[in-house]
């Protein structure tokens, strides 16, 4: 028996003493690269990726630029993970054209890519997991038309050129306005930029163009297509004493924005489901790596939220996702 045990020990040592699959490092390593890391939206994306990694038994590496307009940093992250030979990449492209070649190069190198959140000017990827952003823009436009009774002046504070997701939200909104001749589009050429601070400055500049001699506004409605532009405009309206005096519709949510919806400073918010989006992005990648067929497009849903429905359990979960459960 002793000789048999010794022989078995030597055999295991020669094979590296391979532990059970769940006893060591995960055999699937997925890089999740967001557009940025500062907004609440991206924290929810991070939480969803962590949730998937824990439930599926894979390793997730979270790495992305601090600012959403840092395309070069995001490209460098993609190239770095390709060099490291990760099992797959889940990417939210900051620019629909600038990230096209890095994604193609990754796919050609045998590193599959799942796109989340924002589209790519290419079909050279495994799957696209995202909100129907055009529909979200239309929901905002339809709400604006109803609130203004089909008549009034509206401004759009755009986000940033090259961001496919927000460009679709803007397009959906503008298409609804074009279908309603009683609504006048007073401005659609101002860009907020990638941060809440640049959005605040852009919002102040935009509001200054439409101030009345009495200190009010000569427009009736404002639409902003993402978290930073929405929060920047909210701050500018608050600082001008005009919050709640114009129909403000935003996209996405932070704690400050939810409170502003509760007190009437936002009329409505269009919400995505970022936690589930990232969860499904990682899950789709794992399924692909394991040889399963995955759909080319997965719609993660979009919801218009007002004070009338914000207390519904599912809506409340979208407004305040349990990020801390997965990140702390």
Please provide the spans of the model-predicted regions.
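Sec-dependent bacterial lipoprotein signal peptides
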Residues: 1-13
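Bacterial signal peptide processing site
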Residues: 15-19
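Hinge/beta->alpha junction and helix N-cap segments in small-molecule ligand-binding domains
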Residues: 33-47, 62-73, 95, 118, ...
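Hydrophobic beta-strand scaffold residues
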Residues: 60, 110-113, 185
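Short, hydrophobic alpha-helical segments
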Residues: 82, 144, 148, 207, ...
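Flexible loop/hinge segments that line or gate small-molecule binding clefts
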Residues: 96-135, 143-146, 153, 159, ...
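Hinge/cleft segment of the Venus flytrap/periplasmic-binding protein
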Residues: 164-165, 176-178, 276-328
